[in-house]
């Protein structure tokens, strides 16, 4: 099982043949990993506070699946390797068919 925690109390989980997005510990999206079709990445650099409270680097990934679910996820840039590992697992599940 692979998982990565993101912003807004969200988590992505790849567990065998299933991919799931959780928010606050509750499942919001659960789809077969083999239905994965692609991902779009965006790097974000933004201010933390309203009045110059420092900057933070984030990565946003949008995942597309057969049948319509589109999953957006935002995490610290330091977690990019964890996200890439989940995407590699989704790619291998897709090509295993």
Predicted feature locations:
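Acidic, Ser/Thr- and proline-rich intrinsically disordered linker/docking segments
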Residues: 1-3, 7-8, 27-97
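Short, compositionally biased strand/turn segments
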Residues: 5-25
């Amino acid at each position: 099982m692979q998982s990565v925690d993101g912003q807004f109390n969200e988590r992505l989980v790849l567990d065998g043949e299933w991919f799931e997005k959780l928010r606050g510990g509750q499942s919001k999206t659960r789809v077969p990993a083999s239905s994965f079709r692609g991902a779009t990445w965006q790097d974000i650099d933004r201010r933390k506070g309203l009045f110059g409270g420092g900057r933070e680097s984030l990565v946003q990934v949008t995942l597309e699946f057969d049948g319509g679910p589109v999953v957006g996820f935002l995490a610290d840039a330091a977690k990019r390797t964890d996200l890439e590992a989940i995407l590699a697992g989704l790619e291998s599940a897709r090509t295993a068919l």
